[in-house]
């Protein structure tokens, strides 16, 4: 039951990020992406009609210059905060104050919320009772250009956008790499073991978490390369040592109900 609920929530969240290109086909990105400043002066990227996390041009340059990401089509990043006090209401941004960065090196400034996130107030505050919050960044590359997208926390059905102005790249959570000669083969490397606050890590479920994520993530990959299926190899590490999960995602999987 929990798995079905989680996948349903996941599917809804992924749908928020599935856009159309100029030809009306899903999976594309708007051309002419531009940056704006939010109320506290932090850079935020707007794309596909919504706000998108943009950890500054410096972070983008660091990412593109990092040889470990040379062939990655998608990079997932995480920053964990602890000892955070939150203020705000359903119509304004939640401001994170006095927060110490537990993992990564991005100084938190505010959590920018969409109107649909008002109902998540109680869940958000209940989680903060644990004095920590993890925020994920989702970065994709199209034709050699990096695009930044906000990504949900593992605990919520809503999506949180975190603005920052430090220009320092957060800790890498996972990398997705497709074989250039055979795009049907996709390799995923997880670093969840580095994040002690991660609920997915503590419960020993990184494989199921990323397996669910990959189902939605690979939809764009399959359509982009006109594939019938994708073979995903997920490498991760737990307290029991190195683990590997293999999963095949077929095009027809996206037409089946979760």
How does the language model describe each region?
Residues 6-12:
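Sec-dependent N-terminal signal peptides
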Residues 1-5:
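Positively charged n-region of N-terminal signal peptides that target proteins for export
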Residues 30-258:
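First exposed extracellular module after export/assembly in secreted or surface-exposed proteins
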Residues 15-19:
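C-terminal motif of bacterial Sec signal peptides marking the signal peptidase cleavage site
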Residues 21-24:
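Bacterial signal peptide processing site
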Residues 27:
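Cys/His-rich zinc-coordinating "finger/knuckle" motifs
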């Amino acid at each position: 039951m929990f798995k079905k609920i989680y996948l349903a929530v996941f599917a809804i969240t992924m749908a928020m990020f599935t856009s159309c290109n100029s030809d009306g086909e899903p999976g594309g990105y708007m051309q002419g992406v531009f940056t704006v400043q939010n109320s506290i002066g932090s850079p935020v990227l707007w794309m596909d009609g919504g706000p998108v996390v943009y950890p500054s041009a410096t972070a983008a340059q660091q990412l593109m210059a990092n040889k470990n990401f040379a062939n990655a089509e998608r990079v997932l990043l995480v920053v964990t905060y602890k000892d955070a006090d939150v203020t705000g209401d359903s119509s304004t941004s939640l401001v994170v104050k006095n927060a110490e960065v537990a993992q990564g090196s991005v100084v938190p400034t505010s959590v920018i919320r969409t109107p649909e996130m008002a109902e998540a107030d109680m869940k958000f505050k209940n989680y903060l009772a644990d004095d920590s919050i993890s925020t994920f960044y989702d970065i994709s590359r199209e034709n050699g250009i990096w695009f930044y997208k906000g990504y949900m926390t593992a605990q919520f059905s809503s999506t949180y956008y975190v603005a920052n102005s430090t220009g320092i790249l957060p800790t890498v959570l996972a990398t997705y790499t497709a074989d250039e000669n055979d795009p049907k083969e996709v390799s995923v490397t997880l670093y969840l073991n580095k994040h002690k606050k991660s609920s997915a890590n503590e419960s020993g479920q990184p494989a199921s978490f990323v397996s669910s994520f990959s189902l939605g993530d690979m939809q764009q990959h399959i359509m982009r390369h006109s594939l019938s299926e994708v073979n995903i190899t997920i490498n991760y590490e737990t307290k029991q040592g190195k683990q590997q999960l293999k999963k095949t995602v077929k095009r027809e999987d996206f037409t089946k109900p979760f």
